[in-house]
Amino acid sequence: MSRLEQRFAELKAEGRSALVTFVTAGDPGYDASLEILKGLPAAGADVIELGMPFTDPMADGVAIQLATLRALEAGQTLAKTLQMVREFRVGNQTTPIVLMGYYNPIHRFGVEQFVAEAKEAGVDGLIIVDLPPEHDAELATPAQAAGIDFIRLTTPTTDDARLPRVLERSSGFVYYVSVAGVTGAGSATTEHVTEAIARLRRHTDLPISVGFGIRTPEQAAAIARLADGVVVGSALVDKIAQAKDAGQAVKDVLSLCSALADGVRAARV
């Protein structure tokens, strides 16, 4: 059983949803980013998505684009992101880490080398937003062969004809993007999310995590009553942007994570 399978199974037994937190690797700098990463589990994060900075983050809203820019300006590379996971794993062998980003940096790094190093570092899953199922052979197949889950995004515009193809080789969990568009924009109604999850469950037994637009403990609690996982990214990244220094960024991100975790746990079904 993979770390992701284990974590979702444990939470299902507890009768609650997972808090899935997103931060960009290297934002606002390597050391502060690593401190945030190491602090997230104790602050209540059940699964961590770690963004791989890329110069053209087309699916991301302004907050995460700016986070990517800060990370790249601070010298973050894919090699450093993998090193960050290695350092995290020294003290934490249980919290799943999912790398999220775009295919280009992985292609440049070399797929075979990336998969080998990601596995060795302790990466549990990948979300590659610009790699559709038609290109499974390029990364999804070798990643899954190495024991790394490949997590698919589905959206309100993914129709019933397309869903089976998208979900066919998915593993770990399904990431439902509750608002079509870029990250951090708007939020979906609970009625819409309820319908969407019911539709997804007709096609998959995988846990379903819902993200995009969730910013407050109250919103997190509302989604936690419906989904297997609640994904929060832009709200955490905004705390880094607003902080006066790296120390404040660490403190504020972990404080918000703790509040979100309280919301998710209060919604135990």
From Swiss-Prot:
From the UniProt record, which GO molecular function terms apply? Answer: tryptophan synthase activity
> Where's the active site on this chain?
E49 (proton acceptor), D60 (proton acceptor)
Q: Which cysteines are joined by disulfide bonds?
A: none
List the InterPro entries hit by this protein, alphabetically. Aldolase_TIM, RibuloseP-bd_barrel, Trp_synthase_alpha_AS, Trp_synthase_suA
- Presence of the UniProt keyword Cell membrane in the record: no
> What are the UniProt keywords, alphabetically?
Amino-acid biosynthesis, Aromatic amino acid biosynthesis, Lyase, Tryptophan biosynthesis
Q: What is its EC number?
A: 4.2.1.20
Catalyses: (1S,2R)-1-C-(indol-3-yl)glycerol 3-phosphate + L-serine = D-glyceraldehyde 3-phosphate + L-tryptophan + H2O
Matches recorded under Gene3D superfamilies: Aldolase class I
Gene Ontology CC terms, in alphabetical order: cytosol
Q: In which pathway does it act?
A: Amino-acid biosynthesis; L-tryptophan biosynthesis; L-tryptophan from chorismate: step 5/5
- HAMAP family found in the cross-reference section: Trp_synth_alpha (MF_00131)
| Family to which this protein belongs | Belongs to the TrpA family.
What is its quaternary makeup?
Tetramer of two alpha and two beta chains.
* Protein name, UniProt field: Tryptophan synthase alpha chain
The taxonomy runs: Bacteria, Pseudomonadati, Pseudomonadota, Gammaproteobacteria, Pseudomonadales
